[in-house]
């Protein structure tokens, strides 16, 4: 294994990409220590410590712990992700954008440019909401007023635009997906703080006699979740494909059997990130309007752990799982390419029948993948922050009030132990290793796994 790691640095291009990625990640972490002017960072951090199991803790997870200190990178990559989702949705429902996307590299560059503009607009709106919320807070702002609001908007919007640039540079000139790696870096850096928090709870017997069992249960659940994530992320449905024999000159070509691999979770962590970014935006914008008689109830209902939020989060994950697959995989193109090269699925007529068959299988396994993402995302979060079933209206709420307090309020530990964070860390790590392995195999080196880079342990569904 050590030799395979040294192979990375024997390839100049791969070595350059990895070092470039690490350098930009270091810049990202450095920016996380530059505070936004005019904010009492100590009071703000104390407030986050008191609300670590709430929605604020969840949002802070995606900013890499920078929201609690309100650094220049406090918005993280959420504005960029939200802008990307909006543009991708518009390409489906708005015909001129769909035509622009099909124009090739020039069209994609135009859409990317519009995504950047929309990112800046969303960052300005979110930073305005944060500034208003801070002014209404408990002495967080040193000098309230229009000057503080404008300075906060300028600082956070500029920081968000710079993060967007960092992510694009990593994707283009580094290794892995830049945006995912930025989230990954923020979560990994915060893990020691989560471990220290868990140790403090154990030392102070935070949950009374239930403390040892709660910690043991949390550790066991984390191990099981990591194993489950690795298992499902490596799982695929293999559709058998047969190629007919063809005579080319004096040679007989084709005739071999192969398969078409369809990943159970083709979207990876993106559906979870997309759904999270969409649902966090109303909270960040509306944080300063919680006492408003028109929007207060809606903002409260959209709070973390509330039944409405839970329902919308689950629906969002399912929607974006299908939406992402529809973008990255086109059954009609796959079927057409198979037909051109003489390939067919045994028992299925080439052409439209083949496309329909692939689409049917893809629909089923995507649902399995979406349900897997929901399970991974929700079960640990219920343990950490609880699910407020007692807030349901009428008799349902009264019935669920009988549940133990830790079920409705959670254990109150850090979100770094949640399913969403584990899913992102494991998923991004596996995707990055796969890209590095592909670079090694392409240059005739063995990958990290035996048999010349062939990944063992694949599971079929």
Locate the predicted segments by residue.
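N-terminal cationic and glycine-rich segments that engage phosphates or anionic surfaces
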Residues: 1-101, 105-461
């Amino acid at each position: 294994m050590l030799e395979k790691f040294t192979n990375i640095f024997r390839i100049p291009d791969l070595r350059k990409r990895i070092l470039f990625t690490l350098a930009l990640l270091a810049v990202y972490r450095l920016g996380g220590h530059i505070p936004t002017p005019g904010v009492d960072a100590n009071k703000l951090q104390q407030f986050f410590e008191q609300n670590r199991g709430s929605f604020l803790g969840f949002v802070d997870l995606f900013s890499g712990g920078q929201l609690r200190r309100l650094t220049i990178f406090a918005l993280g990559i959420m504005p960029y992700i939200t802008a990307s989702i909006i543009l991708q949705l518009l390409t489906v429902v708005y015909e001129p954008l769909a035509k622009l996307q099909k124009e090739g590299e020039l069209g994609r560059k135009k859409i990317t440019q519009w995504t950047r503009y929309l990112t800046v607009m969303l960052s300005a709106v979110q930073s305005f909401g944060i500034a208003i919320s801070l002014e209404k807070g408990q002495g967080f702002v040193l000098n309230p007023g229009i000057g503080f609001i404008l300075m906060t908007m300028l600082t956070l919007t500029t920081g968000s635009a710079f993060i967007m640039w960092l992510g694009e540079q990593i994707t283009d000139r580094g290794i892995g997906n830049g945006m995912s790696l930025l989230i990954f870096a923020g979560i990994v850096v915060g893990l020691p703080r989560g471990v220290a928090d868990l140790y403090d709870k154990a030392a102070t017997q935070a949950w009374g006699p239930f403390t040892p069992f709660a910690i043991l249960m949390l550790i066991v659940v984390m191990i099981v979740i990591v194993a489950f994530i690795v298992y499902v992320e490596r799982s695929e449905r293999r559709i058998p494909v047969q190629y007919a024999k063809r005579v080319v000159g004096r040679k007989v070509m084709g005739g071999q059997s192969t398969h078409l691999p369809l990943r159970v979770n083709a979207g990876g962590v993106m559906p979870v990130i997309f759904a999270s970014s969409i649902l966090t935006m109303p909270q960040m914008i509306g944080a300063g309007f919680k006492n408003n008689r028109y929007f207060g109830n809606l903002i409260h209902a959209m709070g973390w752990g509330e039944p409405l939020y839970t329902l919308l989060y689950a629906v969002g994950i399912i929607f974006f799982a299908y939406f992402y697959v529809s973008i990255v995989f086109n059954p009609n193109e796959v079927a057409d390419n198979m037909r051109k090269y003489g390939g067919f699925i045994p028992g299925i007529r080439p052409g439209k029948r083949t496309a329909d068959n692939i689409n049917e299988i893809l629909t089923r396994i995507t649902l399995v993948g979406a349900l897997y993402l929901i399970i991974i995302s929700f079960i640990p979060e219920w343990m950490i922050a609880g699910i407020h079933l007692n807030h349901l209206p009428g008799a349902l709420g009264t019935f669920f009030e009988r549940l133990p307090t830790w079920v409705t309020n959670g254990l109150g530990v850090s979100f770094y132990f949640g399913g969403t964070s584990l899913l992102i860390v494991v998923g991004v790590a596996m995707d990055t290793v796969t890209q590095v392995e592909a670079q090694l195999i392409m240059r005739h080196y063995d990958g990290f796994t035996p048999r010349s880079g062939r990944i063992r342990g694949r599971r079929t569904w």
